[in-house]
Amino acid sequence: NAAGEKFSITTLKYFVSNIKLKKADGSEYVVPQADSYFMVDGRDEDTRFAKVIVPEGNYTSVSFVLGVDSLQNYSPIEDRKGVLNLTTSSDMYWSWNSGYIFFKLEGTSPAINDSTGINIFRYHIGGFKDAMQNIREVNVNLNSGESAQVREGLRSNIHMLVDIKKVFDGTNSFSIAQYPTIMVNPFSMNISANFFEMFKHDHTENFAKVDGVF
């Protein structure tokens, strides 16, 4: 990272939700909430694809929330389906704090002064209230690669790059040695503010002949 610290990642998980796409004409399509919650797990390649059905059109940008909105955090537990089901996503939920962990990054770094020699860092970022508001809406411009040209019966694959170093080296850069563990802590807002810089459009594959999803 920018502080010159070496690190290795053991766990990377985060929620993506509330997906919206904007067309070249300025109109916007909001993916229905029921179809708009995904969890990415760095160790599971199958979770790296967020497949949603959208109307035909040329889409020039996509936005999404990195996290889980307050509506779902407050919803009855029995109504939480898919990746929000606490049976399957219990490691991404604070039962003692009644809220989802939006972003989890864990690993090791020799920069940490740990007498045990384990040298573990943990960043569990969540919270949606004013005192600790970590819900971030990320906007990604698709024009830098190629816009998504969705047509009936065809699929557009939008490829994004996720730069995890931006967690440490974004607008609010920090040292792992100084902050080896951040959970329910106001400093978490400094980290979540770096989420805006993590995502970059790489390229788009248009006109794949698979059912109109991307």
Language model region names:
Residues 1-214:
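A short, solvent-exposed, low-complexity linear motif enriched for acidic/polar residues
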